[in-house]
Amino acid sequence: PMELFYNWDDKDLTNALEELGIATLYSKTGKLVSTTPYIEEVLKCDLFVDFSGEMWGYHADLVGKNRFLVGLIKDRVAQLLKKPTVMLAGSQGRFPDPNIKKFAKEVFENFSLVANREAETGKLLIEDGFDVSNLKNFACPAFLFKPASDDEIAPILKKENIDVNKNNKVGFILCGFNMTEAPY
C-alpha cells in the first residue's frame, strides 16, 4: 500500500528513519530487532522495484515534504534487508542538496540494476559524480501502460500460466506526474 511508502503526513520522515535504523541493525547483525508494516511488506518481496521515474531527484519534493529523502530511505531499507533492488524507467536527478546527494549516491550505487529510460540522465549523473556501472539505458516503457480490470487480467494470467497464489511476489513503487492536483 502506498501509505506505507509515503502518506503525505508529518510522520513520513520519522517512520522512514525508524525503518532505516532497524534495517541498518539487521544488515550488521542479521537480526530483526523490530519491524513495521513497510518492513513486513519488503521482507515478503523477492525483488524490490523502484518505479519513481522523475521522482528520483528534486522533482519528488514538489509533491510532498521530504518526499525524495523518504523515498531514498525506503529504497535503502530494502537494500539493507538484502533484497535485490532495481530502479525501472528512471530519469534521475538533479540533487541540489549536497547531503541528500551523498545519500542518493549510496542508494543509487546499491541498486542491482538501474534501467534508465533515456541516455541524457546518465550523462548528468556522471557530471554529479555518480558511479553508473549499474546503469543501462532503454526506451521508456510508459507507452505500454494502460489500465485493465480484473476481468481483463484473468485471461492473461491463465494464458501465461501465472498462479498468483503460487508465484513469487514482486513489490512495485508506482509514482509519477499523474497526480490529480496541480502542479501537474
Regions from the language model: what does each represent?
Residues P1-Y184:
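Active-site anion-handling motifs in enzyme catalytic cores
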